[in-house]
Every structure is written in C-alpha cells, then in structure tokens.
C-alpha cells in the first residue's frame, strides 16, 4: 500500500482482454533509488526496469510493450524512454519481439552495454527476466541450466562494456531476484467461494458483472478488494475459516 504497487497489472476486473501493467514511474508513491541517486548528483540509467517508464533517469529505456504483437513498439518506447537514448533504442529495437523473452532480454542487455559505452552512468538498473519466465513455465523443479547460461551471456555483454570503458574495477555489481517460488499442486479459487456467498455476480457468459468482494490473483497470493460498504471484519473472518478448513 505504501509504494502504490502491489501487482504487475493495474486492477481492472471488468477488462475483456489483457490488463495494463504498472509501467509509469508516476504510479510509485515513494522515492526510488534513482531519485536518491540523482539527488546526490549522480547520473542514472534504467533499462527495462519495472515501473520505470519516464523515470527521470538520464538514460532510461522503459519496460513496456505495444497492445498487440503486430503493433510497432516505437511510439510506446518514445514516450517511455529518455531523449538521450533515442539512437541506442533505434539501433536495437529490431531485436524486440513484443513482450517475449529471451528477445526482450537480448535487447535490454545490448542497450545497457551501449549506454555504458556512450554515457558511463553512475547507477544502472537492468531487468533480465528469462530465468523468471522459464521458472514460471517449467515449475520449481524444471531444468534451468539453459536459462542460467543465457543470463550469464547477457551479463557478459554488460561486463565487456564495463571493461572497455575502464569501469569494471570500480563498479559494484548486484544480482538479485524479485521473488521466490514454491511448488504448488492444488489451487483454491476464492472468487468461486465469493460467488457462492453472493459477494460477486457474473453475466450469462461467465464474465464478471459486479462484485462486493473480489480476489485478484498474484501468483501464490491474492489481493482481496472490497467495496466501501462491505464489512471488512466479516470478510476477514470468512477467509480465516477457509484457511482452517484448507490449511495447505
């Protein structure tokens, strides 16, 4: 609640298709590491880093994609990117295949290396998502050797750029993941429960017509949205009862 970001997607439970993502920096309600870096007089770069479109970083390439796969991504990136990276984006945009990875990661790593060579920012945030993608696709126990080797190769491009510019010895490199993952063999559909309780209503085609209580999926968790008139304590008690009933 404090940051304003609790999911990849902006809640729109009545959307007929894919929901928009939180792409734009303005959605974040607290200062970011980029803000603190710039306040300290440092230059910053964000490359396909989540929720950093129009981030204010001097060398920013947003994480964004066009609504449809066949659409030209240029107008979207033009809005999201900083003017200083226009040539770098134009030189590398042919690598993009909509939102698909590993192509997005190949594009991002190449742009990051080019930014380092051209501008040498003090801070760079780079998001590579292929391991995440493969983990979601193959499961916790899937073979990720290929994905790890791929990411290793992309990081090699970035390190090569640092070595060429003489910055590798004076650079702190931090690798991190944005979430963990647990094995799951059962699913619980909270909205089916809410429907039985009369807390949400569906149309004839099964789509959502209205709700008083709604569960928005977020992988192994869910966010429960309530209309203002709904008794929060009552909903909480029902959920606790279900947790006791289904402890797994």
Predicted ranges, named:
Residues 61-63, 139-144, 188-194:
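Short secondary-structure boundary/capping segments
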Residues 97, 101-105, 140-151, 231, ...:
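Residue-level preference for long, well-ordered alpha-helices that form the structural scaffold
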Residues 7-22, 157-248:
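Secreted, luminal/periplasmic, and some membrane-associated catalytic domains
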């Amino acid at each position: 609640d404090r940051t304003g970001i609790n999911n990849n997607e902006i809640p729109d439970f009545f959307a007929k298709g894919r929901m928009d993502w939180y792409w734009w920096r303005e959605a974040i309600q607290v200062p970011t590491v980029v803000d603190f870096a710039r306040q300290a007089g440092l230059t910053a770069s964000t490359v396909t880093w989540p929720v950093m479109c129009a981030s204010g970083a001097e060398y920013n390439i947003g994480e964004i994609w066009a609504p449809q796969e066949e659409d030209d991504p240029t107008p979207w990136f033009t809005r999201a990117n900083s003017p200083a990276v226009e040539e770098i984006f134009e030189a590398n945009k042919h690598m993009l295949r909509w939102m698909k990875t590993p192509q997005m990661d190949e594009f991002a790593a190449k742009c990051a290396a080019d930014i380092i060579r051209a501008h040498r920012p003090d801070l760079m945030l780079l998001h590579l998502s292929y391991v995440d993608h493969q983990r979601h696709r193959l499961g916790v126990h899937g073979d990720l050797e290929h994905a790890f080797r791929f990411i290793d190769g992309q990081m090699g491009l970035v390190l090569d750029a640092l070595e060429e510019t003489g910055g590798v010895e004076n650079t702190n490199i931090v690798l991190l993941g944005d979430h963990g993952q647990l094995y799951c063999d059962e699913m619980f559909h909270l909205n089916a429960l809410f429907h039985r309780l009369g807390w949400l209503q569906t149309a004839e085609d099964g789509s959502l017509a209205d709700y008083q209580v709604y569960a928005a999926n977020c992988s192994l968790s869910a966010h429960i949205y309530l209309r203002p008139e709904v008794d929060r304590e009552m909903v909480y008690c029902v959920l606790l009862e279900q947790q006791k009933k289904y402890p797994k």
